[in-house]
């Protein structure tokens, strides 16, 4: 309750100082006197930084920055400007959620994390990039913020579940929450990407097994290797639960460079998250659909690299789902799973929330790809992951708070402009002439 008022300007906190001048837009705003130097508290800071659009980076830019003369000072100057902008943009949208959702303890907790992280970042806006102690403290702050936000996804999911249990869901609220969560989680993925890159490059704790990685990015990500890893781990879970599991049939075609291993510049953990989730779904459907037969058809995976796209198609024979249910699989508000407890980051991520598919789709869309489902009811389902083959085209997809976004939350959703068929058969006898 207090946090909602805080973001809306109902309560003031300690004054925060001038804005960073790392970009022309922020610098000019500060120089013209329109910056937040004279404003008090979090609301003024959020309003100021939300006026600026986030700066999307391409995979190539991430790669070039980390591999060619990686400079901690440059990263410091960019992140102290960019992170507040990304945080503020999504914080403005959080404040537009229904009041009853904002009052849930879980959403309050998420808001407190974002406020604290924003304030910690703004402590560096006037500090010199030439001061070694400042650079060290900033990296330490970045790692602390990253760890603080570990449980953002399940905690926000818990808040939505709390709201749903207490107040139910109407179509308008469901549509707005779906719109918000897609943008909120995409923002979270992007913020974590920046935090991870800085902490892995300059935090001194890079994994020895990932020496060729540039932060969290593998310049030569072996797609088939990641797919096999996801399959084996999903298979272990399937064997534990069903005491059996379907085999994997994998085929790869490198149409771009025939005969060579399929490799792309990508974040292996993102690809792993997607294929692991799809394997779990495919295995469960296959085991349950063929339970009475005792013979389980294999899961087929085709990997193709073309000039523009890397495509991964996973096909199962798990019985499929009706067309009308496909959209529900990506709906955050639809999950019928029992509410799990959010305890620590060591818990199985998103277990029980039904968020696996929508979050996986966001990972695919983050660098301009996509994830789509095509189902043949009674037979099985094809899941297709699209990834940009060129690192120059793999550019972050970032939400921006603007008038169009504001209107989406505030617009009155009118009646459908298409006829809605009746659930009951029409009694045609009423139209008979006497």
Swiss-Prot record:
Residues bearing PTM N6-succinyllysine: 403
Interval spanned by the transit peptide: 1-26
Gene Ontology biological-process annotations: cell population proliferation; hypoxia-inducible factor-1alpha signaling pathway; intracellular signal transduction; intrinsic apoptotic signaling pathway in response to oxidative stress; regulation of acetyl-CoA biosynthetic process from pyruvate; regulation of glucose metabolic process
Top-tier EC class: transferase
UniProt domain Histidine kinase: residue ranges: 161-391
Organism: Mus musculus
Summary of the function given for this chain in its UniProt record: Kinase that plays a key role in regulation of glucose and fatty acid metabolism and homeostasis via phosphorylation of the pyruvate dehydrogenase subunits PDHA1 and PDHA2. This inhibits pyruvate dehydrogenase activity, and thereby regulates metabolite flux through the tricarboxylic acid cycle, down-regulates aerobic respiration and inhibits the formation of acetyl-coenzyme A from pyruvate. Plays an important role in cellular responses to hypoxia and is important for cell proliferation under hypoxia.
List of residues binding ATP: 277-284, 316, 335-336, 352-357
Modified sites of kind Phosphotyrosine: 136, 241-242
Modified-residue entries (Phosphothreonine), positions: 336
Keyword flag Repeat: no
GO MF terms held by the record: ATP binding; pyruvate dehydrogenase (acetyl-transferring) kinase activity
Entry keywords, A to Z: ATP-binding, Kinase, Mitochondrion, Nucleotide-binding, Phosphoprotein, Transferase, Transit peptide
Protein name (database record): [Pyruvate dehydrogenase (acetyl-transferring)] kinase isozyme 1, mitochondrial
Reaction it catalyzes: L-seryl-[pyruvate dehydrogenase E1 alpha subunit] + ATP = O-phospho-L-seryl-[pyruvate dehydrogenase E1 alpha subunit] + ADP + H(+)
InterPro entries linked: AK/P_DHK_N_sf (IPR036784), BCDHK/PDK_N (IPR018955), BCKD/PDK (IPR039028), HATPase_C_sf (IPR036890), His_kinase_dom (IPR005467)
Pfam families in UniProt: BCDHK_Adom3, HATPase_c
Annotated GO CC locations: mitochondrial matrix; mitochondrion; plasma membrane; pyruvate dehydrogenase complex
Subcellular location: Mitochondrion matrix
Similarity remark: Belongs to the PDK/BCKDK protein kinase family.
Induction record: Up-regulated by glucose and palmitate. Up- regulated via the HIF1A signaling pathway in response to hypoxia.
PROSITE patterns: HIS_KIN (PS50109)
């Amino acid at each position: 309750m207090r946090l909602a008022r805080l973001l809306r300007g109902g309560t003031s906190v300690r004054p925060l100082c001038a804005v960073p001048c790392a970009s022309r837009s922020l610098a000019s705003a500060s120089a013209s006197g329109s910056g937040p130097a004279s404003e008090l508290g979090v609301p003024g800071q959020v309003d100021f930084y939300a006026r600026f659009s986030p700066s999307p980076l391409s995979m190539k830019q991430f790669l070039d920055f980390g591999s060619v003369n990686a400079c901690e000072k440059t990263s410091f100057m960019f992140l102290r400007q960019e992170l507040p902008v990304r945080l503020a943009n999504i914080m403005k949208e959080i404040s537009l959620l229904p009041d009853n959702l904002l009052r849930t303890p879980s959403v309050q907790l998420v808001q407190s994390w974002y406020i604290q992280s924003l304030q910690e970042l703004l402590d560096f806006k006037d500090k010199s990039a030439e001061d070694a102690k400042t650079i060290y403290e900033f990296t330490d702050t970045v790692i602390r913020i990253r760890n603080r936000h570990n449980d953002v996804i399940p905690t926000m999911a818990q808040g939505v579940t709390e709201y749903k249990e207490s107040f139910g869901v109407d179509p308008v609220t469901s549509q707005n929450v779906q719109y918000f969560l897609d943008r909120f989680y995409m923002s979270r993925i992007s913020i974590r990407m920046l935090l991870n890159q800085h902490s892995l490059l300059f935090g001194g704790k890079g994994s020895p097994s990932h020496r060729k990685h540039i932060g969290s990015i593998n310049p030569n990500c072996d797609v088939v290797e990641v797919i096999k890893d996801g399959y084996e781990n999903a298979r272990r879970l399937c064997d534990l639960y069903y005491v059996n599991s379907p085999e994997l049939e994998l085929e790869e075609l490198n149409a771009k460079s025939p005969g060579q291993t399929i490799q792309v510049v990508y974040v292996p953990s993102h690809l792993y998250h997607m294929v692991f989730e799809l394997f779990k779904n495919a295995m469960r459907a296959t085991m349950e659909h063929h339970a009475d037969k005792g013979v389980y058809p294999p899961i087929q995976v085709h990997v193709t690299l073309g000039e523009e796209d890397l495509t991964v198609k996973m096909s199962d024979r798990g019985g499929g789902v009706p067309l009308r249910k496909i959209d529900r699989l990506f709906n955050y508000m639809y999950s019928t799973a029992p509410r799990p407890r959010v305890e620590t980051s060591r818990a199985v991520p998103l277990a029980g929330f039904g968020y696996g598919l929508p979050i996986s789709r966001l990972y695919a869309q983050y660098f301009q790809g996509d994830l789509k489902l095509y189902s043949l009811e009674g037979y099985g389902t094809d899941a297709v992951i699209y990834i940009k083959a060129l690192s120059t085209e793999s550019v972050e997809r970032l939400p921006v708070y603007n008038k169009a976004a504001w209107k989406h939350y505030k617009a009155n959703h009118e009646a459908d402009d298409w006829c809605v068929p009746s659930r009951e058969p029409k009694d045609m006898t009423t139209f008979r002439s006497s």
